[in-house]
Amino acid sequence: MNDPIFVKNKIKPFNKIISVTGDKSLSIRWALLASQAKGKSRAYNILRSSDVINTLNCLKRLGIKVKLKKKYCEIEGFGLNKFNNKKQITLNAGNSGTLGRLILGLLVCHDKKIRVVGDKSLSKRDFSRVIIPLKKFGAKFKYKKNYKLPIEIIGTRNH
């Protein structure tokens, strides 16, 4: 097995307003990044598709505070790699390959066993391009043959 990779530099805090379109991919990525910030992040005009709602639900299951209001979404995170779930949980990515792949990356430094599932279509997709590199960070995985969902990840606190 290869040596683990360690990320040393963290993103410095900033207080900026960033304007983007209500796009599914951007909305998912914003929510996941906001979950890693310390404090509140607010986005206006996020897309309210099933993939984005599944993302917000996954973050809630991980103990992140999420408020979805009529005009905005607010996420209150605890900082980098700081999820607040106390037990093993299952996260449902629905049909979102973006969510399924990116959430695995966030869970690498989480020390709880997390099961990621998806719908019938997503469960046919190959996750090897994510799992193989993430193993270098020290995470352990259990999955069906050919790197398919459901996937269990046990991360590592080595970060």
Regions found by a protein language model. Name each.
Residues 1-159:
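Structural preference for solvent-exposed beta-strand-turn elements
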